[in-house]
Amino acid sequence: MKEKVIVIGGGLAGSEAAWRLANEGHRVILYEMRPKKMTPAHKTGNLAELVCSNTLGGLELTTGAGLLKAEMQKLGSLVIEAAKVARVPAGGALGVDRKIFSEYITEKIESHPNITLIREEVKEIPEDEVVVIATGPLTSDALSEKIKELVGYDTLYFYDAIAPIVEAESVDFSKGFWGSRYGKGGDDYFNCVLTEEEYKKFYEELLKAEKVKPKDFEKAVHFEGCLPIEEMAERGYKTLLFGPMKPVGLVDPRTGKEPFAVVQLRKENKEGTLLSLVGFQTKLTYKEQKRVFRLIPCLRNAVFVRLGSMHRNTFIQSNKVLTHYLNLKKKENIFFAGQITGVEGYVASSATGILAGINAGRLARGEKPLKAPTETMLGALVNYIVTKEGELQPMNPVFGLLPPLEKKVRDKKKRKELMAKRALETMEKWIKENNLVPEGLVKVC
């Protein structure tokens, strides 16, 4: 039996971390507070309970989630194994029977000889042990306080405010100009220009658009200083013109005049292939976001890789406190995994659990932790959350995070196919070089 590792949280990420560590021969103590103490969203005491959708996203390798799932399978993912056992028809997506899925994972964890499952709320972090914290978006108040003390009070967030992100190549750059306010900061922003007539149409449709109904446990959340754009619009016709759409300090070089209104797009990655809509956090439904935001002239044909949202979500500013290994910069024996790291979605959460498990095990054995290659979707996603400049908001796996191909490929589908091929080949090489798949860990269902 190898060294002990503690995992706090029995969701998707915690289950993956525990499974990985146990199969490497470590003695794992897994803490899960349910069913003794429930969250407002969970209904059972099962491990890896899915509280939102019952699909794990698309299977196509040309989608971010599909590619990440393929990488996870190569790493011996328990979540992918369970999803295949519990699979239900869901078109091109990997849909599962929630009950079968969570019961399968619970049984696997409970019956593993190297895992001790303790059903208790953790109120203190054992800072002298190797620990993986994977407590998710609804981390208990007591543990949240301890995490705050550990990472710093300004680096633990309790809600997210996600603005949409579009593919740069889908933006019509003839409908605006690059530049910063008052000429400061260079060409950091692309300014989508709206005439008064275009603004009026956008404003009216924004007010009419359907919103997502908040869950009961989210109703008390106040987004101080970070209002949804539709709520700002409800305060009056000109409110947005003094907020995220203000034209002050910007001169359109095509006219020599200040535009009536602008929507600023900011680069989300170094390559500039992804652009976010600045200040456009929203609670509109996904369908309505696409309809309304495409009324902005430069976004008429926009391809959205992430849509906006605002909801209750406990997560850390990983870019300030974590390394590429998913451990704390200041305390290398403490790892984080799952949604609490600032990744979005079931698959991304699960994948970070695998990586945290790999590196917690290596550290416990006195070995050097490993950085996942950025050519893989797992490596690219982790690289994003730990290196993002400014404020981190949750991110899902998208192709725009991957480094470009050495040779430029114009056809978008072909480009994604080649990126996926490179990612899987890189993952296989990384696994082989570092002996990352213990015998019997990968099961074909």
UniProtKB/Swiss-Prot annotation:
<keyword id="KW-0808">Transferase</keyword>
<keyword id="KW-0520">NAD</keyword>
<dbReference type="InterPro" id="IPR002218">
    <property type="entry name" value="MnmG-rel"/>
</dbReference>
<dbReference type="Pfam" id="PF01134">
    <property type="entry name" value="GIDA"/>
</dbReference>
<keyword id="KW-0521">NADP</keyword>
<dbReference type="GO" id="GO:0002098">
    <property type="term" value="P:tRNA wobble uridine modification"/>
</dbReference>
<keyword id="KW-0489">Methyltransferase</keyword>
<dbReference type="GO" id="GO:0005829">
    <property type="term" value="C:cytosol"/>
</dbReference>
<comment type="similarity">
    <text>Belongs to the MnmG family. TrmFO subfamily.</text>
</comment>
<dbReference type="GO" id="GO:0030488">
    <property type="term" value="P:tRNA methylation"/>
</dbReference>
<dbReference type="InterPro" id="IPR020595">
    <property type="entry name" value="MnmG-rel_CS"/>
</dbReference>
<dbReference type="InterPro" id="IPR036188">
    <property type="entry name" value="FAD/NAD-bd_sf"/>
</dbReference>
<feature type="binding site">
    <location>
        <begin position="9"/>
        <end position="14"/>
    </location>
    <ligand>
        <name>FAD</name>
    </ligand>
</feature>
<dbReference type="InterPro" id="IPR004417">
    <property type="entry name" value="TrmFO"/>
</dbReference>
<keyword id="KW-0819">tRNA processing</keyword>
<dbReference type="GO" id="GO:0047151">
    <property type="term" value="F:tRNA (uracil(54)-C5)-methyltransferase activity, 5,10-methylenetetrahydrofolate-dependent"/>
</dbReference>
<dbReference type="GO" id="GO:0050660">
    <property type="term" value="F:flavin adenine dinucleotide binding"/>
</dbReference>
<protein>
    <recommendedName>
        <fullName>Methylenetetrahydrofolate--tRNA-(uracil-5-)-methyltransferase TrmFO</fullName>
        <ecNumber>2.1.1.74</ecNumber>
    </recommendedName>
</protein>
<keyword id="KW-0285">Flavoprotein</keyword>
<comment type="function">
    <text>Catalyzes the folate-dependent formation of 5-methyl-uridine at position 54 (M-5-U54) in all tRNAs.</text>
</comment>
<keyword id="KW-0274">FAD</keyword>
<keyword id="KW-0963">Cytoplasm</keyword>
<dbReference type="InterPro" id="IPR040131">
    <property type="entry name" value="MnmG_N"/>
</dbReference>
